[in-house]
């Protein structure tokens, strides 16, 4: 009977707009519609075509803000990269002097590190983190802090994780701490009316941008934590960072932080509230490369050249 048949589900409006802009023209599977009609159990459905899935992934990647140099980052780090897990041991009070005043601060101490296979961990992390994100309700976010010197490969590894998230259809955002703070911290005391209007427009945009980071982004990469201490108003900068990280932790959304700070530096530098959040929601790792990883990657630049034939 006709009552057993369900009409084909209409194509979403946002997809219709993309179809009209000829995003899928030339696809033989769907004829340029982006969707394929299928029949299952007597019902007609519209199933996204492979070309539409590819388009979706490309859009997620484009919006992610991942630098071009890392768009193909993958779990292919070689054995020159050591990857060590530091488990928190507990807190210890220490007497420090800040601006000439002696104060007690708690420092987070760690157990002896365990060396791990960095590529294997990356694959496991993606599987587990996405499984946590898909849980209802979300009760845990497994965030990472990747500490290491310049050129150790920590940003490459963070972006390899981000790319795998994207390949699985998850929203990702990459931010350099400098980029984030330079956009957020503006001079609000200008008397120039035009600048005031421009500033308000930017802040309205940033409020929406920040809300997206806090509420909708499945994975945030925050690169080069520690930059905020180079700002003239580092108290405001630190408050912005803390607010961003706290909101994501409260919503059980994972964040990967990279920093040049050593782990003991990190826990001594930041206030107790932030250190406590790190201990509760973040896994600590130290990345070491026997050579500068960026120099190793630059060897690829020589491919295709026959330098021997050019020698006089």
Predicted segments, located by residue:
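A short, basic N-terminal segment
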Residues: 1-124, 293-312
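Short glycine-rich substrate-engagement loop in P-loop NTPases that contacts/grips substrate
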Residues: 87, 113, 118-123, 166-216, ...
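Phosphate-binding P-loop
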Residues: 128-141
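Walker A/P-loop nucleotide-binding motif
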Residues: 140-158
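P-loop NTPase Walker A phosphate-binding motif
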Residues: 155-170
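Loop/turn-to-beta-strand initiation segments
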Residues: 170-171, 216-219, 251-257
